[in-house]
Every structure is written in C-alpha cells, then in structure tokens.
UniProtKB/Swiss-Prot annotation:
Transmembrane segments: none annotated. Keywords: Lipid-binding. May bind long-chain fatty acids, such as palmitate, and may play a role in lipid transport or fatty acid metabolism. Signal peptide: none annotated. SUPFAM superfamilies: DAK1/DegV-like. Hexadecanoate binds at T61, S94. InterPro entries: DegV, DegV_C, DegV_domain_contain. It comes from Streptococcus pneumoniae (strain ATCC BAA-255 / R6). GO terms for molecular function: lipid binding. This is DegV domain-containing protein spr1415. The keyword Acyltransferase does not apply. Residues 3-280 form the DegV domain.
C-alpha cells in the first residue's frame, strides 16, 4: 500500500509532519478587508490576529479548492499511490466534507476515504500524525480507518471565549445574551459536539471559575485511557502557558502541548480565546 494523506491548512501540524512527502495540504484562503491571504504562506497566525483587530468586519474564510484536490488525486496513480485518505476540518464548520464525497469512487485504481473528523486545529493535526504512525507500523487501510473512527469518536475541544461580542458578530450568540453576559461576567464554555458543531456547553461566572471548570471537564473526559491534551489559544500565549501549568499541577500527565488557533477558528472565536483539546492515543 502506498498511501497519500490529505488535510487542510486549518490543521495544526508539526514541522516534522509537514516534511512528509506523502502529505498534501489544501490551502484555506482567508479574506480580510478585501485582501486574500493563506495562512503559512503570506500570513502568520500572529499577523492574522493583528489584521483582524484592525479590520472593519470579520474575516471570511473560503473552502479548500476542490479543483486542486481533483488535480492531485488525478496525478496520484501515476506516482504509484494505491490509497488516499483525506482528513479535513469538521463538517460542522465547513461544507467541504459534503462537497467532496462524490469523489471517493471517481479515480480508478485508487481507494479513497474522506471520513468526517468532527474537529480541526491541533487535534486534527494529531489525527494526521496518527495515520502516518499506523501506516509506518504496518497497518492496512481498513485497520487505519477503524482506528481513526475510534479516535474521532473520542476527540473534542472545550473552549473559553474572551470576547462575547465576537460570538455575536459570528452569529453564535444573540446581542441581548452578550450584553447580559458581559454585565454578569459570564464566560460561556463552548465545545465541539458529536456532530462537529461548535455550541455552548455551559455558562460560568468569571474567567477564573471558567478556567477551573475547563480543567475539571478535561479531567473527567480523559479519566479512562491515554490521551494527548493540547492547550490551544487565540494569540494569548501567556494565558495558554499558565493553563498548561495548571493542567500539569492537576496531574493530567506530562504530555500537554501548546498550539495556536489559526484563521479558520480564530475568525469564529476571536483573540484571547483558549481551548483544551484532547485526543486518545491509539
């Protein structure tokens, strides 16, 4: 089996994974005040947050290019590939997953699967890494898909948003709820539900209590089995490092890494947001 793995630029990937010759990353363009950027090419995460703060309206992200995906899939067979696996951002965030399902049977001699990851950012990047690890240890395509299905079903992220007004602009919270929330210092905790949609999990008074509750949730959800936990932030590295230390103090293992929300999720959540993602080690 020669396996090609696809993902998109919403995935937070390690430098080592990005060097994989069998990895193909589709760009997700982001439009800020009429200018188009691609994160990692002409826009860093830090620059994105700076530009978003100065923009007259929320940035808009597009879907990855189906034409580019088709072009690469068409070329794979002549390069000796037999299988292709695409791990793209959640169908609850983007319509891309639905848009490409027709392509699965369109390439003769190539076995293709596009499962719905129901997630994005760092957990998505770890899924990509996991697929390469399973392949390298000799797993066949069916076994990789089985392990991936288990991993997807037990992966999520819980998020604390700094700016409620940002959720209003993105249509995820009513203006009245945001005004009341700001008056009462309410910090909603959001999460990726089992359809991969970001929704409110619960509402907590004050950031301190919300942070404590985030840690409790992760402790509960990762109690059985081995998990990797990731602190993901929207241009708030000091807050993220502080939360990482809290996790270590609570005994949530030594494998707690840091990552940054890129433009796709950063547009929804705004600067200062912070999340705890978790994914099982399989």
């Amino acid at each position: 089996m020669k396996l090609a793995v696809f993902t998109d630029s919403s995935a937070y990937l390690s430098a080592e994974t990005l060097q994989r010759e069998d990895l193909f990353v589709l760009d997700i363009p982001v439009n800020i005040d009429g200018e188009e950027y691609v994160e990692g090419i002409n826009l860093s995460a830090e620059e994105f947050y700076q530009k978003m703060a100065q923009a007259s309206e929320l940035p808009k992200t597009s879907q990855p290019s189906i034409a580019k995906l088709d072009e690469i899939l068409t070329s794979l067979k002549e390069q000796g590939y037999t299988h292709a696996l695409g791990l793209f951002l959640s169908s609850g965030i983007s319509g891309f997953y639905q848009s490409i399902q027709y392509m699965v049977d369109d390439y003769e001699g190539l076995t293709i699967a596009f499962p719905d990851t129901l997630i994005t950012s760092a957990p998505l990047g770890i899924m990509v890494e996991s697929v390469f690890n399973w392949r390298d240890q000799g797993d066949d395509f069916a076994s990789i898909q089985d392990k991936l299905a288990i991993q997807i079903s037990r992966t999520s992220a819980f998020i604390m948003v700094d700016d409620l007004d940002h959720l209003v602009k993105g249509g995820r919270l009513s203006n009245g709820a945001a005004i009341l929330g700001n008056l009462l210092s309410i910090k909603p905790i959001l999460y990726f539900n089992d359809q991969g949609v970001i929704e409110v999990y619960e509402k907590v008074r004050t950031e301190k209590k919300a942070t404590k509750r985030l840690i409790e949730i992760i402790k509960e959800t990762t109690a059985s089995g081995q998990y990797r936990v990731i602190v993901i932030h929207g241009n708030a590295p000091e807050k993220a490092e502080e939360l990482r230390q809290h996790l270590l103090d609570f005994g949530l293992g030594s494998d707690v890494s840091l990552a940054t929300f890129g433009s796709v999720i950063g547009t929804h959540l705004g600067a200062g947001s912070i999340a705890l993602g978790y994914i099982p080690v399989i």
